[in-house]
Amino acid sequence: MFYSIVAIFVGAGFGALLRWFLSIGLNALLPEVPLGTLASNLIGGYLIGIAVVAFATRAGLPPEWRLFVITGFMGGLTTFSTYSVEVMTHAVQGEFGWALAVAALHLIGSFTLTGLGMWTARAWLAPA
């Protein structure tokens, strides 16, 4: 149990730091669509697609690696709560078009990149 807790804790820290760096670097570029949050969710969607397939095909890996990557790192990197606030801020200000655009970008983009990540992992991990 101790190693599981440490794996999640460390992974979440790294994921949160990456999210913070992305926000610092990208959010000011287009304030209507905070690109740092979008990048966090899209990158996270792609990486979790890879991770799910990789862990499913590598059953011998210690469970702490899955906890580190999926529960910790992806949990720290991706952010539904920030996304929700950004969408609702537009809606409350009467900017319904922006609210819909931000919501659609995150949802469609994340689903697309998760599928692409799964496809990538299957291609990489396919028997030669």
Swiss-Prot record:
GO terms for molecular function: fluoride channel activity; metal ion binding. Na(+) is not transported, but it plays an essential structural role and its presence is essential for fluoride channel function. The chain crosses the membrane at residues 5-25, 35-55, 67-87, 96-116. It is a multi-pass membrane protein. InterPro entries: FluC. Keywords: Cell inner membrane, Cell membrane, Ion channel, Ion transport, Membrane, Metal-binding, Sodium, Transmembrane, Transmembrane helix, Transport. Disulfide bonds: none annotated. This is Fluoride-specific ion channel FluC. It comes from Burkholderia mallei (strain ATCC 23344). The lineage of its organism: Bacteria, Pseudomonadati, Pseudomonadota, Betaproteobacteria, Burkholderiales.
